[in-house]
Design a protein with these regions (language model features):
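Long, hydrophobic, well-ordered secondary-structure blocks that form the structural core
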Residues: 1-39
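Secondary-shell segments that build the walls of catalytic and ion/ligand-binding clefts
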Residues: 29-147, 157-197
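Short, hydrophobic, well-ordered secondary-structure elements
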Residues: 1-14, 110-114, 153-161
């Protein structure tokens, strides 16, 4: 989902202490390793993916010995070593740290869009009242699609602005009238969006 992508972009781009960065990296690798174990264990003997289990254990050692990890509360530490979390501090916190979202807007947007991808009740309880029809889409169907496209556009614009800011800061010689005009137009559009303000 594009909201996840934008959050991850800002999360990985953030200028942070080496210990925090190392912990984030180990947690991402642990999540990947645990996901792979869940995938292969249905079809393989444990001995066939022993390397993944060994890798998981090595990552757990690295996480537990990380200086930033030891500063976290016990509840957060327990969550991180499950391999179920992608973001240190959780996704909501990561999204808030991007500075791109108001918390209520993020929660509402993420909840609504993920409900459809997970076939949660919000995605089908109102089928009849919203006149859901795949031959002749209803207003509710168009509104949902428009909302998703607007969110995707806003997220891509926000990431583009962040990258352009970085690029123009690092390579000031690349500034020109076109770039200035383009960036300003993006900023104007971004500033008028209710999504992030």
């Amino acid at each position: 989902m594009i909201v996840d992508g934008m959050t991850m972009f800002f999360y990985l781009w953030e200028d942070i202490d080496d210990n925090v960065w190392d912990l984030r990296y180990f947690v991402l690798r642990l999540h990947d390793t645990v996901a792979r174990i869940k995938l292969v264990r249905a079809w393989q003997d444990k001995s066939d993916y022993a390397d993944l289990i060994a890798g998981k254990n090595e990552l757990l050692e690295k996480i537990r010995s990380n200086a930033h990890y030891r500063l976290l509360g016990e509840d957060q530490q327990e969550k991180l070593v499950t391999g179920e979390q992608i973001f240190v501090g959780g996704m909501r916190r990561a999204a808030m740290q991007t500075g791109a979202w108001r918390e209520e807007t993020f929660i509402a947007t993420y909840n609504y869009l993920s409900a459809h991808s997970h076939s949660a009740p919000i995605s089908f309880f109102r089928f009849s009242s919203h006149s859901i029809d795949y031959r002749s889409p209803s207003h509710a169907q168009f509104a949902s699609a428009c909302f998703a496209i607007e969110i995707a556009t806003a997220c891509l614009r926000r990431v583009t602005l962040r990258y352009l800011d970085y690029h123009l800061e690092k390579f000031p010689q690349s500034k020109n009238e076109f770039a200035d005009s383009f960036v300003q137009k993006l900023r104007d559009k971004d500033g008028t969006r209710y999504l992030f303000t």
